[in-house]
Each structure stands twice: as structure tokens, then as C-alpha cells.
Design a protein with these regions (language model features):
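A conserved FAD-binding loop/helix module that cradles the flavin
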Residues: 290-313
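Beta-rich nucleic-acid/ligand-interaction surfaces
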Residues: 64-65, 69-86, 240-255, 327-330
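A glycine-rich dinucleotide-binding beta-alpha-beta segment and adjacent secondary-structure elements
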Residues: 3-18, 171-179, 232-294
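Helical element adjacent to the flavin cofactor pocket in flavoenzyme catalytic cores
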Residues: 30-87
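C-terminal segments that line or cap access tunnels to active or ligand-binding sites in enzymes
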Residues: 140-250
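Active-site-proximal substrate-binding core of FAD-dependent oxidoreductases
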Residues: 70-76, 313-352, 360
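Conserved redox-cofactor binding core of oxidoreductases
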Residues: 1-52
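Mid-domain catalytic core of redox enzymes
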Residues: 72-190, 326-330, 344, 351
């Protein structure tokens, strides 16, 4: 392709990984093929409906899900995880699955001396993705002329990306993505209303940007950008608004540096060079999420969960072949020794139930 606009149309998908299309490994050009060849699907009830469907399926299989119970500490015997401590007490485990943000979980829940490859010092030197400035809006009136997905790229897209990834400053003309799900799924808002999801790529947490001071002004810039795609009188129509900045991603959602796409997908941090699903620094600890293999993005994260569950099953079969289980001591002395228990770190809250059907979107 010679036209730069067409080139961007077939490469901007790298932002799904939080990366610049001018630097992203060419492996990820497959994303544009998948999108244009097979289309994009919307789960009725939103992406949260997928999590809810999974929750119902696991509960039918006997799992118990504990929400609003943050894990305060992972308990170890040597390098082996034997349980977690939460506000309600200690929960023992034979296998621990960490689906919290990887770097945050390591730096807050795992003692630094227990880690070899992923120490605090090494994490600080890793390259992390950009962050996002988010606006979740409930609007008066329908917006049937606005497509389900709208992507606006800044006129000077290279400059926009340089501001984000190199200079770590706020750009005067940001790119953005808007989702208007009610045109496909009317149940995503009350009758006669619309819900909008606005995502603006920005730098991850950096000393150059003080979000306590900049949020109001940057919101104004974003609203002005939204007017360019025909969203007029926005402030007058807003009935609900929630904003998330990189600072809030870090403080409220426990995302390391507010880097919403986790470790950057550079050649040095891809595939086997990411933290392994069977975590290499600890025993009986498994990872899922954007920080492990294969990488970030919801479909890919689901694949990481599939990989991890298969590894747990393989390891459990090996354990069943043994005839002797050693006694536990230290922190493990507080842990109930009942065999077969499991602990899962829950990093998200499930919303109200919704159907799990899919609709193809434009």
C-alpha cells in the first residue's frame, strides 16, 4: 500500500497491544487480517457477560467465587506457594493462579528475595506499554448515526505516538476509540439512552504528567476531539460519567505504572521471554493475563487461561502418582492441610448477569 491512510488502516491494530504500528513486530500484522477477514463480534451484555458465563460454568463444576476479598499476602514454604491471606483469613492452596496485574502482584505480594528473574529491580528496567485515559459515559438520547466502533487517528499520528512512547507528555491532538454498543445491543443502556466507552491512548505513569492537575484540561481536549466525529452537545447530554487516568489505573485498579496493556510486546519481551504461565520463579504458582504468554488483549488473555489450565491439569496428574505428601511448616503451619483445595486471586468484579450470545458488529 502506498497511501499512508490505507497503511494505517491495516496497522493501527497494534494499539490493541498498546504499541506503535511503526515499532510493533510484523508478526502482529495478522491482527488486521483476522479483523477484516473474520469480522468483530460483540457479546450481548458486553464483554463482562463472557466473564459471567464463565463464572456460572465454573460454579456448576463446584467452584466457589469470592468477590470483594483482596489478597493481602501469598504464603510460602520456601519457594512454594501454600496459601493466601485475605481479610477473612487464610485460604490454603495446592496451586495458586495469579490473574492480577503481573508486575503489581510480584512487587506487592511476593517477597523480592524469592524471585530471581523478575525481581523489583529487573521489573523496573522492563519496557511497559502505554496507558489509557478512559471515559465511561451514560448519555441522554440515542446515537444511532454513530457506528458501534469508531477509531479516530490524529492528523500527525507519528507525533501523537512519539508524545506517548518517547516524550511521555500529553498530546494536543490525541487519537481515540469510541464504542457505541447500543446500536448493536440496546440492552447496554436504558431505553432512550446511550452508553459510550471512550479510550484515549496516553503515556503510562510518568513524572512528566501530573494527572491531579491535568485531568480536567485533558478531558476538555478529548471532548473537542469527539465533536470531530459528530458527537455534539456532549456535556449537556451526560447523565453518568466515570473517568480513569493512568494514575487511577495504578491506585484504584492495581495496574503497575498504569500500563493497561502490561509488559510491552517488544522482541525482548515476547513469547518465551514473557513470564511463563507455569511461573518460573516460584513453585505451584501459575499466571494468566496480559503479563504472561501469549500477551495482552482479551481474546489472547483467554488463550493464556486455557494454556495455564492445561498446565495445572498436567501437573495435578503427576502429583496423583505420588504416594507421599511431605508435611508443611512455617507459614504453611497456619494453612489447613486438606488436600484438593485451591486459591485464585480475583482481579476483577463481575457485574449483573447477562446472556452470553454474540452479535457481529460493524
Amino acid at each position: 500500500f502506498k497511501d499512508p491512510r490505507v497503511r494505517l488502516a491495516f496497522s493501527f491494530q497494534s494499539k490493541y497491544l498498546g504499541m506503535s504500528p511503526f515499532r510493533c513486530p510484523s508478526l502482529f500484522t495478522i491482527l488486521s487480517f483476522l479483523e477484516y477477514e473474520h469480522g468483530v463480534f460483540h457479546p450481548r451484555g458486553g464483554c463482562g457477560a463472557v466473564s459471567q458465563a464463565m463464572a456460572r460454568a465454573t460454579e456448576k463444576l463446584g467452584a466457589r467465587i469470592h468477590l470483594n476479598e483482596p489478597v493481602e499476602e501469598i504464603l510460602f514454604e520456601g519457594r512454594k506457594a501454600v496459601g493466601v491471606r485475605s481479610k477473612s483469613g487464610i485460604r490454603p492452596c495446592d496451586a495458586l493462579v495469579v490473574n492480577a496485574d503481573f508486575a503489581h502482584a510480584m512487587s506487592h505480594l511476593v517477597p523480592n528475595p524469592l524471585r530471581k528473574r523478575w525481581t523489583d529491580e529487573k521489573l523496573e528496567k522492563k519496557k511497559f506499554s502505554c496507558s489509557t485515559f478512559m471515559m465511561y459515559l451514560g448519555l441522554e438520547g440515542r446515537m444511532d448515526d454513530l457506528a458501534h466502533h469508531t477509531i479516530y487517528l490524529a492528523d500527525d499520528y507519528r507525533r501523537n505516538l512519539r508524545d506517548i512512547e518517547d516524550d511521555h507528555v500529553l498530546t494536543a491532538q490525541p487519537s481515540f476509540y469510541v464504542q457505541n454498543p447500543t446500536v448493536t445491543d440496546p440492552g447496554m443502556a436504558p431505553e432512550g439512552m446511550s452508553s459510550l466507552y471512550v479510550l484515549v491512548p496516553v503515556t503510562h505513569q510518568h513524572d512528566n504528567v501530573d494527572w491531579a492537575r491535568e485531568t480536567k484540561a485533558f478531558r476538555k481536549v478529548v471532548v473537542e476531539q469527539l465533536e470531530k466525529v459528530g458527537i455534539d452537545d456532549l456535556d449537556q447530554r451526560i447523565r453518568y460519567e466515570k473517568i480513569l487516568t493512568p494514575a487511577l489505573w495504578e491506585s484504584e485498579q492495581s495496574i503497575y505504572k498504569g500500563a493497561t496493556f502490561n509488559l510491552a510486546h517488544t522482541w525482548g519481551q515476547m513469547l518465551s521471554r514473557r513470564p511463563h504461565n507455569r511461573f518460573e520463579d516460584l513453585e505451584s504458582v501459575y499466571l494468566v493475563g496480559g503479563g504472561t504468554h501469549p500477551g495482552s488483549g482479551l481474546p489472547v488473555i483467554f488463550e493464556s487461561a486455557k494454556i495455564t489450565s492445561q498446565l495445572i491439569e498436567e501437573d495435578a496428574r503427576k502429583v496423583k502418582k505420588t504416594t507421599f505428601l511431605p508435611s508443611r511448616s512455617g507459614d504453611a503451619g497456619e494453612v489447613d492441610r486438606a488436600w484438593g483445595s485451591a486459591a485464585t486471586m480475583q482481579s476483577s468484579t463481575l457485574g449483573k448477569p447477562a446472556s452470553g450470545s454474540l452479535s457481529k458488529t460493524a
